């Protein structure tokens, strides 16, 4: 089993091609390759304005990478996993401060603070949403 979880967006096209080539060659006869990433359309992750812009841009890039993956992994299957999330606003804001999602990694502290204020006014004590992961599975023949 080779598992790639929510990291494909850190790679460029050539790196993805190389990763897939090496992963396929290292798989055992009955091995599986699983690639997980955020669902790229209709994502429900609670965002502040600037975070949403960065997330959309990142997910658009993921779409391109998924096309490359589907071409390279012939006969792969695509599925989705839904996770019902119920989190306190306080805990979610702590996660934002720690930049839990990669679109926040290079965001200036001032923008992050503005976004946190936006989330504080937008949400009540609890935040509920469905987090959906896309999974591409490939089995070596």
Residue ranges and their predicted role:
Residues 3:
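A conserved beta-strand element that flanks and buttresses the S-adenosyl-L-methionine
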Residues 6-7:
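Short catalytic micro-motifs in class I SAM-dependent methyltransferases
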Residues 13-17, 113:
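Non-membrane alpha-helical structural segments and their capping/turn regions in soluble enzymes
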Residues 17-32:
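A short glycine-rich, Lys/Arg-flanked "PGG" loop and its adjoining helix->strand segment in the class I
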Residues 32-62:
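Conserved class I S-adenosyl-L-methionine
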Residues 55-77:
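Active-site capping/gating segments
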Residues 76-141:
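Conserved Class I S-adenosyl-L-methionine
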């Amino acid at each position: 089993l080779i598992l790639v979880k929510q990291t494909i967006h850190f790679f460029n096209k050539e790196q993805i091609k190389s990763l897939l080539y090496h992963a396929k060659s290292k798989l055992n006869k009955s091995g599986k390759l699983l690639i997980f990433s955020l669902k790229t359309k209709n994502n429900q992750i609670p965002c502040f304005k600037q975070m949403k812009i960065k997330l959309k841009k990142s997910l658009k890039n993921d779409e391109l990478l998924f096309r490359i993956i589907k071409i390279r992994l012939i006969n792969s299957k695509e599925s989705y996993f839904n996770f019902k999330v119920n989190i306190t606003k306080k805990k979610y804001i702590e996660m934002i401060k720690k930049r839990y999602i990669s679109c926040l990694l290079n965001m200036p502290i001032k923008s992050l603070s503005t976004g946190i204020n936006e989330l504080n006014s937008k949400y009540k004590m609890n935040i509920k949403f469905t987090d959906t992961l896309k999974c591409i599975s490939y089995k070596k023949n």
